[in-house]
């Protein structure tokens, strides 16, 4: 609807106005940087000046200012027009948006107990503020008037999209509901936002609280040297000198499951990882999931939908539940069959070593690595020296330059969201500034898990001039020990290309209104997944896949083995992904929520009825499935496989020309796909 509501997606759902007057500078505090124009290079947030104490007064003032702007729109004596209503609404909330981008971004990558407490305090206010806008009858009347008389305003394509999206956001926000139902909707929106927040905070605590402490060096058998060095460093940081510590962060737990010879220790860390949020402690998420699914269903019913998935999917390319399930059901049998073949290979490896047991979940990665080596003579550790992080970064920049002519230059003297983050200026092929890209690579305790692309400022136009975006890509790679290189796996390298594809989507954005920058959830993964294709192209590998010590380009024999073995393991990967997609959908197609809903039993039935083998858990189990429970991919986790169909088609357009950097195809892809307002244009399927 406007830039403020859009910014909410970065951290919290925007909400309530407060009429409290706050001094710009609290007694004894430093000046609040949010109350002045940023004087930093390219106008990025002054991270080095922002303190936690600055957020609350700035957010309260931002909400107050936007409320006054809304009042002015409503009180305008002139007849509603596109400019005095739709554009005015789109441009409202400048301060609030400014603060939300900083607050949302930093609470995701550098959260603290103080920030989490502030989130719990502000969520109800922000939820109310959002509803105060969406449920303002006088404001909606003006929006509706413009919508119903749009022919008289002679709008261009972008203006029509803004009008349609604005009107739709009010309708989907409950503007047409009677007052009693609007009151109930407010309650549900606040409840949902708080439950989503609680879920995320609990998951982070569960991830951070566990440590596998190893005292005996023999228990490290099988682990690569750099993994051992990092575990020793983690132990030292926790005051456990002389020991080794492994955590539930992926760069720590995954190598342990993949290489550690000690089966009992693999079991211990595997169970800790897959039971996050399900330990019957203060961070338990089972009741949170139950209440959240129930509240979403109640909201959907209130809005006139039979279930929450129907409410969500109406806005997506899939449109309805049948289309989603048809896609998942089409892929599931072959994926599961392939996973069972891989399981047979794994059990064969166990028997080869004299084991008299069948594989369990904590055995899969360990014995799969052995099976792959037996089949293809390929060890993941053979490839890692060729995927040094700095080289991989140069690889993605090379691809972008070859495709679009854009360049990335590191900026040293600029505020950063974290001291370890890097900043780059992106310039178009004609030298004009496109935006700033942050890259935050390494895991740390206050950082959310996984990898994602976000932003600290959206692109728009102000006074006729383009306001460039500030984009950030966030990862959770293991930070190397002092003086050691950051060596990535092939999967981690693919992740860098993936998130960079999202970043290009943000950097290329060129719209005049905040409200037209959104695209359907099941489309948004297309730019990222297309970018992955270049990661393994021989022409690109020769540029970035160089040995970190010798500079030798990755040998063709190793590339051949990597390509040959590329599909091995897809049974596991696709099955665990589809299992999570089914879990997400099945929660949100429920037509009623039993009072005694047992989350563990529900999950077991959803996956058991489809024949999921016990050795493969869902990629995310219910109690730590942030994609769906925290709101970003609710009834939308299927989007990755949906977009995969599109990205294969899109990359094929390059391959058919015989040039993976074909400038004509690249130009069309940028124009029709990487510009959000034009997401529907794909190849010949326009």
For the regions a language model picked out, list residue spans one by one.
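C-terminal motif of bacterial Sec signal peptides marking the signal peptidase cleavage site
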Residues: 15-16
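Active-site-proximal, well-structured secondary-structure segments within enzyme catalytic domains
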Residues: 158, 162, 194, 201, ...
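Post-HEXXH active-site segment of zinc metalloproteases
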Residues: 507-530
């Amino acid at each position: 609807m406007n830039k403020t509501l859009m910014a909410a997606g970065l951290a919290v759902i925007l909400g309530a106005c407060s009429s409290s007057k706050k001094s710009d500078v609290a007694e004894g505090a430093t000046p609040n940087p949010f109350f002045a124009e940023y004087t930093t290079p390219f106008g990025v947030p002054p991270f080095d000046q922002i303190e936690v104490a600055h957020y609350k007064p700035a957010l309260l003032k931002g909400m107050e200012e936007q409320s006054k702007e809304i009042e002015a729109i409503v009180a305008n004596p002139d007849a509603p027009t596109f400019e005095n209503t739709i554009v005015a609404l789109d441009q409202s909330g400048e301060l609030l948006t400014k603060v939300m981008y900083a607050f949302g971004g930093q609470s995701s990558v550098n959260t603290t107990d103080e920030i989490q407490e502030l989130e719990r305090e502000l969520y109800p206010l922000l939820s109310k503020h959002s509803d105060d806008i969406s449920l303002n009858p006088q404001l909606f009347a003006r929006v509706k008037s413009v919508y119903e008389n749009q022919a008289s305003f002679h709008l261009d394509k972008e203006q029509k999209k803004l009008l349609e999206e604005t009107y739709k956001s009010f309708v989907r926000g409950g503007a047409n509901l009677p007052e009693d139902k609007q009151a109930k909707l407010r309650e549900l929106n606040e409840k949902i936002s708080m439950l989503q927040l609680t879920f995320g905070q609990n998951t982070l605590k569960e991830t951070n609280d566990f440590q596998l402490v190893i005292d005996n060096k023999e228990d490290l058998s099988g682990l690569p040297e750099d993994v051992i060095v990092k575990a020793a460093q983690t132990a030292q940081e926790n005051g456990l000198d002389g020991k080794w510590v492994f955590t539930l962060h992926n760069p720590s737990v995954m190598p342990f499951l993949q290489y550690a010879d000690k089966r009992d220790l693999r079991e211990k860390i595997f169970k800790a990882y897959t039971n996050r949020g399900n330990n019957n402690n203060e961070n338990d998420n089972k009741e949170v999931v139950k209440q959240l699914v129930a509240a979403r269903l109640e909201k959907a019913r209130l809005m006139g939908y039979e279930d929450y998935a129907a409410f969500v999917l109406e806005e997506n390319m899939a449109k309805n539940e049948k289309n989603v399930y048809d896609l998942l059901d089409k892929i599931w049998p072959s994926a599961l069959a392939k996973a069972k073949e891989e399981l047979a290979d794994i059990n064969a490896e166990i028997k080869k070593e004299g084991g008299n047991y069948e594989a369990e979940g904590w055995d899969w990665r360990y014995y799969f690595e052995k099976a792959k080596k037996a089949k293809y003579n390929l060890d993941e550790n053979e490839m890692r020296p060729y995927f040094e992080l700095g080289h991989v970064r140069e690889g993605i920049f090379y691809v972008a330059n070859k495709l679009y002519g854009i360049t990335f230059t590191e900026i040293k003297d600029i505020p950063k969201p974290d001291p370890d983050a890097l900043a780059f200026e992106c310039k178009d092929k004609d030298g004009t500034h496109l935006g700033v890209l942050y890259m935050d690579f390494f895991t740390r305790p206050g950082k959310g898990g996984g990898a994602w692309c976000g932003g600290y400022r959206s692109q728009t136009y102000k006074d006729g001039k383009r306001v460039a975006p500030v984009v950030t890509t966030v990862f959770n790679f293991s930070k190397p020990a002092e003086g050691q290189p950051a060596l990535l796996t092939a999967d981690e390298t693919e992740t860098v290309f993936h998130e960079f594809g999202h970043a290009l989507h943000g950097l290329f954005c060129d719209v005049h209104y905040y409200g037209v920058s959104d695209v359907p959830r099941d489309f948004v993964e297309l730019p990222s997944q297309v970018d992955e294709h270049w990661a393994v192209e021989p022409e690109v590998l020769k540029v970035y896949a160089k040995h970190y010590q010798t500079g030798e380009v990755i040998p063709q024999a190793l590339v051949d083995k990597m390509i040959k073995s590329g599909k091995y393991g897809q049974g596991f990967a696709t099955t665990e992904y589809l299992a999570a997609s089914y879990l997400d959908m099945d929660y949100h197609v429920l037509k009623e929520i039993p009072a005694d809903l047992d989350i563990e039993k529900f999950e077991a039935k959803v996956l058991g009825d489809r024949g999921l083998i016990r050795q493969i858990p869902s990629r995310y189990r219910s109690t730590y499935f942030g994609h769906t429970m925290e709101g970003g991919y609710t009834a939308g986790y299927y989007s990755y496989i949906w977009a995969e169909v599109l990205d294969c088609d899109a990359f094929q357009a390059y391959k058919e020309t015989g040039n993976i950097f074909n400038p004509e195809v690249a130009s069309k892809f940028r124009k029709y796909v990487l510009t959000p307002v034009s997401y529907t244009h794909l190849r010949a399927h326009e």
